[in-house]
Amino acid sequence: EPSWQDWCVDFAPPDISTDSPIDQPNAQPWLAGRRIAIARDAAFSFIYPANLDCLRSMGAELCFFSPLEGDALPPCDALWLPGGYPELHAQALHANQVLRAGIGEHVAQGKPVWAECGGMLALCEGVTGLDGNIQAMWGLLPGQVIMQNRLGGLGMQQLVLDTGLLRGHTFHYTRLETTMQVHTRSSRPGAAVQPDRGEALYVHGSVRASYFHAWFPSNPAAVAGLFGATIQA
């Protein structure tokens, strides 16, 4: 039975636990001259090496920083907050108010943010634990994250953007209660978008946020669009 990564691209990628680069299909220098800041530490650890290779293949300069270590947002043209477990580090993340202010200024300037699953959670107002206790987060997106014992989403997904179809997956134990309007939704492979199924994509200012985990090599052009490149659909 093929893995979801095999479905996500037209070729079978190598072992994603390694840092060896892979070929990127149809990648062009759409991100040349752009600097992308990427949160990477114990709170934001869900990063496929192939996704980094995809960004580099399009000419992006990558700059990593650690919210948990108290880092400020580096000078950048775009920001990626990947998945992970920020709810386990809520106190330390909330304490990094320099980073919160930097992200707020980044958004105020209209610079793009891609917040993926845990990255989206970190931007929300707070996290309600299984014990009912609320821990504050960065409060840059309206909404409260609710921890739950059962899965909130699991499986292969696709997300149709203006610049094309991205493939990926979803896996989370939380739900988001928010007043943000749903821009679109992901769907199962080959299925049509349904109003009450799949993962919501939220667009809030220059922030795009979703529980959807994107496999960047599935459509480099669509990824470039997420990070601010002008792509003709």
Regions found by a protein language model. Name each.
Residues 28, 32-106:
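Phosphate-binding active sites in nucleotide-utilizing proteins
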Residues 33, 58-60, 75-76, 109-111, ...:
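Short coil/turn connectors at secondary-structure junctions
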Residues 62, 85-158:
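Cysteine-nucleophile active-site neighborhood
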Residues 37-38, 63-64, 80, 115, ...:
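Structured core elements
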Residues 42-44, 69, 85-87, 120-121, ...:
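Short, glycine-/Ser/Thr-/acidic-enriched flexible segments
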Residues 81-85, 119, 205-207:
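Short acidic (Asp/Glu) and glycine-rich catalytic loops that position anionic groups and cofactors
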Residues 1-35, 145-233:
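Amide-donor transfer/coupling interface in amidating biosynthetic enzymes
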Residues 51-53, 93-96, 128-131, 184-185, ...:
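Short, glycine/charged-enriched secondary-structure capping and boundary segments
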